[in-house]
Regions:
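Polytopic transmembrane helical bundles with strong interfacial aromatic enrichment
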Residues: 1-159
Length: 159
């Protein structure tokens, strides 16, 4: 597995992403990833908190307006995340925490889709399990993402 990761890491794009002084290279990608996380996590956290009863004056159906914000954040994170993986493929793809992060994000997306199809379309209050799961998954996505720079097992770049 490592040999194909080394090939990606030796590519011109991977090297440029890691080593370029251009602001739109690695630092810019990190900024886009952070903004995407803010949009996705912020909107899903707002949904989860409202569904748990916080800010009851906001109608549940108004939460539907946050769903596109979450999708925009997810799209930004997918695009920037792919570039971050290209920059350090060995570091990312040999780290079990990376796969946990992806699993958590897929689960959070499933919860948001469930909410969008049901609860957010009517003014009914869901059980506490779904919004609690959404908040926990949102927090786990952030935590696992923040752990990635510190939990890698293999780093090929620069050797």
């Amino acid at each position: 597995m490592v040999s194909w990761l080394e090939q990606i890491e030796a590519s011109a794009l991977s090297t440029w992403l890691r080593e370029s002084d251009a602001m739109y290279a690695f630092p810019g990608i990190l900024i886009v990833h952070t903004l995407g996380m803010a949009l996705a996590a912020g909107s899903t956290a707002a949904m989860g908190l409202r569904l748990l009863g916080i800010a009851r004056q906001i109608p549940l159906t108004s939460l539907r307006e946050l769903v596109p914000v979450a999708w925009i954040g997810l799209v930004l994170n997918i695009g920037s995340g792919l570039l971050l993986v290209v920059a350090y493929p060995t570091k990312a793809l040999t780290n079990p925490i990376f796969y946990l992060k992806l699993l958590v994000i897929v689960a959070a997306v499933a919860v948001v889709r469930h909410l969008d199809r049901g609860v957010l379309r009517v003014a009914a209050s869901p059980r506490k399990l779904v919004p609690t799961a959404l908040l926990v998954l949102t927090a786990l996505a952030i935590v696992t993402g923040r752990l990635l720079p510190y939990t890698y097992r293999h780093l090929m770049a620069g050797h």
